[in-house]
Amino acid sequence: MKHTAEFLDTHQTQISSILSGGYNHPLLREWQNERQLAKNMFIFPLFVSDMPDEDQPIESLPNIRRFGVNKLAGYLKPLVAKGLRAVLLFGVPMKPNSKDEFGSAADDPEGPVIQAIKLLRAEFPELYILCDVCLCEYTSHGHCGVLYDDGSINREQSVRRLAAVAVNYAKAGAHSVAPSDMIDGRIRDIKLGLLAAGLAHKTFVMSYAAKFSGNLYGPFRDAACSAPSQGDRKCYQLPSGGRGLARRALRRDLDEGADGIIVKPSTFYLDIMADASEIAKDVPICAYHVSGEYAMLHAAAKAGVVDFKSIAFESHQGFLRAGARLIISYMTPEFLDWLS
């Protein structure tokens, strides 16, 4: 005998349990998002070489290239036309003997970052320019500060050197400085340096307050030639399980004068982003979708595991849901097209 489908009497269902009427249409699903991705949220990282005519693909970062100053304007012009609003500059010294123990090339007036700042201010007056402030790309040892003879970080000299670099970027025309070194006390010294230079009122200090050590930076270190020659950065970058430390670092950097906060990496640290949006609710929170995260999504899409556009939106919408207002993303060029 054929079984007859049975229907239970559900007349006691609570009205409040019916949710699907709120998202049964594509527009309704958009309205359910607390925030929408928009072009003005995106910050595009740029690797700027001290070889003026360089235009070199980075194998471990699909679709990302390293440019010399002479190639920057031509590359950026169509992106600016599509709505690019902000870039984050990383200098990459490639010339022989360009690195030393103090990272002297970081703020060399003839170096890649200061030359790029001046070029971009002239060519794209409306483009917002952030500069990463760190020494790892420029030091002979590849660490983010000045070292003692035993290889440990000399905090006092490091923060003084980082402050000098930040001030020199601001003097050259950078709108924002973004210290990524994670050395204790550098936000205070940078803020004091900007005050002394008369630039604090027009320079946004975007602190990498919650930057974790881990396994997601490999492609970046290829691009920036910044891997440590010995040891690692675990003594100054946060341990991956250190949520309490991250909360303390967020409070510290706010107390020292940070105007904005970066959480890095992002996908695996949404709890930290949510913490940041609570602790630093009065300043912009920025998610950094780092090189390893970007490369993983490309690899998954290439293997046919995911659709690249769909996973890009899902991951980046997750940052907004966790509390980010801004996103540093290597996918910025794609999003400029997708959001048009």
UniProtKB/Swiss-Prot annotation:
Name of this chain's protein: Delta-aminolevulinic acid dehydratase
Cellular component GO terms held in the UniProt record: cytosol
Annotated gene: HEM2
Key words of the record: Heme biosynthesis, Lyase, Metal-binding, Porphyrin biosynthesis, Zinc
Binding-site positions, 5-aminolevulinate 2: 291, 330
Protein's UniProt keywords contain Transferase: no
Top-level division of the source organism's lineage: Eukaryota
Subunit text: Homooctamer.
SMART domains linked to this entry: ALAD (SM01004)
Enzyme class per UniProt: lyase
Name of a matching Pfam family: ALAD
Enzyme active site: 211, 264
Binding site for 5-aminolevulinate 1: 221, 233
